[in-house]
Swiss-Prot record:
Family named by the database record: Belongs to the bacterial CoaD family.
Annotated site location: Transition state stabilizer: H17
Binding positions for ATP per the UniProt entry: S9, F10, H17, G89, L90, R91, E99, D124, S125, F126, I127, S128, S129, S130
Protein's name according to its UniProt entry: Phosphopantetheine adenylyltransferase
Any GO CC annotation of this UniProt entry: cytoplasm
Gene: coaD
Pfam families, alphabetized: CTP_transf_like
Lineage: Bacteria, Bacillati, Bacillota, Bacilli, Lactobacillales
Gene Ontology biological process terms in this record: coenzyme A biosynthetic process
Entry coiled-coil feature ranges: none
Organism of this sequence: Lactobacillus johnsonii (strain CNCM I-12250 / La1 / NCC 533)
Cofactor: Mg(2+)
């Protein structure tokens, strides 16, 4: 069996992410969940917070290890960790088109590195970290869309923001 990485910003990690990661953990010897930084995104949680939340979520899965590599190319991280595959989740055709393009770049950088695409369940196909943040910003309840530690952290962020406005 080979090792794989599942890179993402995970701001925050959602039930859709968890579903894909849990499924992929059964396919590989080791799955590294890699907290990365996307320079085009504005983050709600710090890198350290995202790392801690993801570690809490997967603390009982010995095949999953959560690490942070904020300023590296995905291909470089895969090389460092001895991973032969990159796992990505798909919700819809827009995700497919985006992931196909990224997989093409990664394949150009390393012809031996494969991308494995896993679909989320249809009932989770609408969940995105951006949608979660937007819903929380306006006071909506997302507790059924994210793991419990994430729901608690989102509630705390919202409470702190509301206290700052007073």
């Amino acid at each position: 069996m080979i090792k794989a990485i599942f890179p993402g910003s995970f701001d925050p990690i959602t039930n859709g992410h968890v579903e894909v990661i849990e499924g992929a953990s059964h396919m590989f010897e080791k799955l590294y969940v890699v907290i990365m930084t996307n320079t085009s995104k504005k983050y709600l949680f710090t890198e350290k917070e995202r790392l801690e939340l993801a570690r809490k979520v997967f603390e009982n899965n010995e095949k999953v290890e959560v690490i942070a590599r904020p300023a590296e190319l995905t291909v470089e991280v895969a090389h460092e960790l001895g991973a032969g595959a990159i796992v990505r989740g798909l919700r819809n055709t827009a995700d497919f088109n985006y992931e196909r393009d990224i997989a093409g770049i990664n394949k150009t950088l390393d012809p031996d590195l494969n991308t494995v695409l896993l679909f989320t369940r249809p009932e989770d196909s609408f969940i995105s970290s951006s949608m979660i943040k937007e819903t929380v910003f306006f006071g909506g309840d997302v507790s059924t869309l994210v793991p419990k530690p994430v729901a608690a952290a989102l509630e705390e962020k919202l409470r702190n923001r509301n206290n700052e406005k007073k």
